[in-house]
Every structure is written in structure tokens, then in C-alpha cells.
Amino acid sequence: MAEQKEPVKRRVALKLIKLGMDTRQVVARFEAERQALAMMDHPNIAKVFDVGATEAGRPYFVMELVRGVRITQYCEENELTVPESLNLFTLVCRAVQHAHQKGVIHRDIKPSNIVVTLHDGVPVPKVIDFGIAKAIEGDLTEQTIYTQYQQFIGTPAYMSPEQAELSGLGVDTRTDIYALGVLL
């Protein structure tokens, strides 16, 4: 969390690569994440406000601060009915569909990446953490992102069979749809 002072005052989330973690691979994934988020304009996806680099050259992005709890925790704690839970789930599906229409696969849909926050007392789910997102076609950044052969990318319990194969081949929008099914 950070305090933005210009051009307006507001609390924001600031994502910055930690010192010593700025390998080429980490920087490339970071830039892909901020590019993926910058392409989105959906009420159920956390918004990016600004991107840049510090004076020392460390890349960062400033985004909407989403305060809330995991979607599963929200549903349990508030004892939502099935129709109420499905209403939240439908909003998440629309957000993922928006990402797909923008050419982005999230690849890590899971409860901790869907935060429910309250807006005027109304629950609003927000899809967050596009850190391992992948472009459907082409690249999200000019920097090359290397995924090592048989490198594990994602959360096993929510992975599609294609994603779990570790080849990276065959991963497309169905990967996110599979994860949504597991979440449901």
C-alpha cells in the first residue's frame, strides 16, 4: 500500500521488484503483468493507474488498492446462498472473458486471486495478480519471457491438464475456463 500524492491524493497498491530479485526473467514477467493489466478496462479487474521506473531504474506500477477477502472466504463468512454465490461467480467469469477478449490468459485463477471488496455495501469481486499471464497471440512485452522446459507455472489444484503437462503447449483460454470450473 502507498499514498499517491499527484495528480490526485489516494491510497494505491504499488508493485515494485525487490532489490536483488531483478533478474531478466523477473523483469520480463513483471513488464508482461503490467502490460496485461494496462490493457484491461473492466469493473471486476484491478485497474492500473500508472507505470514507470524509479530513479534507480527499478520498474513499478501503481494500481487500484483492492481491500477485501478471497472469494471463497467471503461466500463462507457471509453464508451466501447458491444464487448469491453464482452472481459473484458470474461477475468473475465476465472479467475473465474480458481478459480473453483483450488477448490475455490469466493462468492462475484461484480464490486468492479473486478478492471481494464492498462498494456501498455491495460485494464486488476483483480479479488480481496477472503475474503469470500469457498473451493468446504474440507477446505482452518486447522482452522475451523464458519458461523453462517442464517449469511449473500456476497453482496445481486449479491447473488444467494442458497446463499441468509442463510443456506450455496447448495452454489457451480453456486453461482459465477449467480453473473457473474448479473454483465453482
Model-derived segments and spans:
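Conserved ATP-binding/catalytic core of the eukaryotic-like protein kinase fold
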Residues: M1-L184
